[in-house]
Amino acid sequence: MPFTASDICKIIFAVILPPLGVFLERGCNSDLLINILLTILGVGSILASMNPA
């Protein structure tokens, strides 16, 4: 399964701003809220790197 341009953009967004990466992948649901809270607490980057795309 090759990477597409949208996959690369999602990865970049997930590294820079983890909630945006989650929003692009999963939409607006509880995953986004959890990621926003974890980002505020400082662990959102770890969660984003562990989230399979």
From Swiss-Prot:
Q: Tell me which PROSITE patterns the record gives.
A: UPF0057 (PS01309)
Q: Where can this protein be found?
A: Cell membrane
**What Pfam families would the database entry show?**
Pmp3
Gene Ontology terms, cellular component aspect?
plasma membrane
> What transmembrane ranges does the database entry give?
32-52
Q: Where is the signal peptide?
A: none
Sections of the chain in a coiled coil: none
Which keywords accompany this UniProt record?
Cell membrane, Membrane, Transmembrane, Transmembrane helix
Q: Which membrane topology term applies here?
A: Single-pass membrane protein
| The protein's role, per its UniProt record | Plays a role in the regulation of membrane potential. Could mediate a proton leak.
The UniProt family comment states: Belongs to the UPF0057 (PMP3) family.
User: In its UniProt entry, what is this protein called?
Assistant: Plasma membrane proteolipid 3
Please report the organism this UniProt entry assigns to the protein. Answer: Chaetomium globosum (strain ATCC 6205 / CBS 148.51 / DSM 1962 / NBRC 6347 / NRRL 1970)
At the highest ranks, the source species' classification is: Eukaryota, Fungi, Dikarya, Ascomycota, Pezizomycotina
